[in-house]
From Swiss-Prot:
A motif (BH2) lies at residues 150-165. It comes from Rattus norvegicus (Rat). A motif (BH1) lies at residues 98-118. This is Apoptosis regulator BAX. The gene is Bax. Homodimer. Forms higher oligomers under stress conditions. Forms heterooligomers with BAK. Interacts with BCL2L11. Interaction with BCL2L11 promotes BAX oligomerization and association with mitochondrial membranes, with subsequent release of cytochrome c. Forms heterodimers with BCL2, E1B 19K protein, BCL2L1 isoform Bcl-X(L), BCL2L2, MCL1 and A1. Interacts with SH3GLB1. Interacts with SFN and YWHAZ; the interaction occurs in the cytoplasm. Under stress conditions, JNK-mediated phosphorylation of SFN and YWHAZ, releases BAX to mitochondria. Expressed in a wide variety of tissues, with highest levels in the testis and ovary. Pfam families: Bcl-2. One of its GO terms (cellular component) is cytoplasm. The modification N-acetylmethionine is found at M1.
Length: 192
């Protein structure tokens, strides 16, 4: 930061380029963290990590804590385990679209999207389909760019995530995120 609220080398915190760059970094870090907890070292996920500023470290920690809470939601884990990954692209985009179908955007839903993407990546790791990993990450970033970018810009960039999750308790947040993802998976199963 140069004191003006602008981040060096990518426009301000609400520029499309900076939001996508930060989003890609957060998604990669989130997926690597989830995979590392499940499978230990995952060379398929070893990606170049740019240096983190204090804000990005806080965002990463926020996502990690929410992910830890979601991992302990057994109903959500059961539903995700039941997702058929024979056509993962269709599954991903249908669930992602269902999460935002009502036109109401919020940080809980963005985190739910990241969490769902991480679970699909972990399934790909378990089924030894490593080429699917980068593909799922690409789908997530495409969805972010096409459907969520303007909303994230309107929230002041990724720092809005910290403001959103700074007030309620973690249990409240994770119950909300788990509810969004569970509802989306339920709708997807009924339609599929």
């Amino acid at each position: 930061m140069d004191g003006s609220g602008e981040q060096l080398g990518g426009g301000g915190p609400t520029s499309s380029e900076q939001i996508m760059k930060t989003g890609a970094f957060l998604l990669q870090g989130f997926i690597q963290d989830r995979a590392g907890r499940m499978a230990g070292e995952t060379p398929e996920l070893t990606l170049e990590q740019p240096p983190q500023d204090a804000s990005t470290k806080k965002l990463s920690e926020c996502l990690r804590r929410i992910g830890d809470e979601l991992d302990s939601n057994m109903e959500l884990q059961r539903m995700i385990a039941d997702v058929d990954t024979d056509s993962p692209r269709e599954v991903f985009f249908r669930v992602a679209a269902d999460m935002f179908a009502d036109g109401n955007f919020n940080w809980g839903r963005v985190v739910a999207l990241f969490y769902f993407a991480s679970k699909l990546v972990l399934k790909a790791l378990c089924t030894k389909v490593p080429e699917l990993i980068r593909t799922i990450m690409g789908w997530t970033l495409d969805f972010l760019r096409e459907r969520l970018l303007v909303w994230i810009q309107d929230q002041g960039g990724w720092d809005g995530l910290l403001s959103y999750f700074g007030t309620p308790t973690w249990q409240t947040v994770t119950i909300f995120v788990a509810g969004v993802l569970t509802a989306s998976l339920t709708i997807w199963k009924k339609m599929g």
